[in-house]
Amino acid sequence: MKRILSGIFILLSVLTFSKVSDKKVQRGKNNKLKDVELVFILDRSGSMQGLESDTIGGYNSMLLKQKKEKTGKVSVTTVLFDDQYELLYNQVPIDKIAPMTEKEYYVRGSTALLDAIGKTIMQIKANQEKKGNSEKVLFVIITDGMENASREYRLDTVKKLIEERKEKDKWEFLFLGANIDAIGTAGRLGIDSSRAAQYKSDKQGTVKNYEVLNEAIKEVRSGNELKDSWKKEIEEDVKNRGK
């Protein structure tokens, strides 16, 4: 009798685990994320001169498209950086985000990339300590120059922060870089090569960035794992037109 009961218990355990596993696999198809936090860290140092309108237009267009996606709650944090740091939006609901203009985005100064990333990670952590964790956090870092002005954060410190958040909270980090070794730079920051892309720093390349990011964000919001091919169009653009 004990053997029979034991066998029934094992069978029920296997069936229960199988159902739970199936639900996890199917999550992307049937259970879209309810709470996503988008975090943009945008370079506005002097090397971005001439691309102001394209950056503003690309960013605004991307957010407008995301506003039309009626998938769960989305908040936006946007940081503009050069050798100074500006927190433009801090965890603002996406439907309350006003279009960015040349009053906010204008180029100047040098590139304090490490400070921008480090400060923003700490800001998001502080936000979540007050309001609770979002179901998913997606960082998007865009820069067209080498780090040359950070004073508060070092490379090893930022790398540790990124790796901790990826490991503990499953944060996602995307890195888009121009005029640098984007893949190598991302790797030194603790960001996988599959999540980094080299782009061409001109009008077409800038517009392409935001078009591709829009699709990547849609994929993340759907609850699916972001495929390594998310950056294919950016890489093809560089391949066809050069860096």
Model regions and ranges:
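Acidic, low-complexity intrinsically disordered regions
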Residues: S6-G7, L11-K243
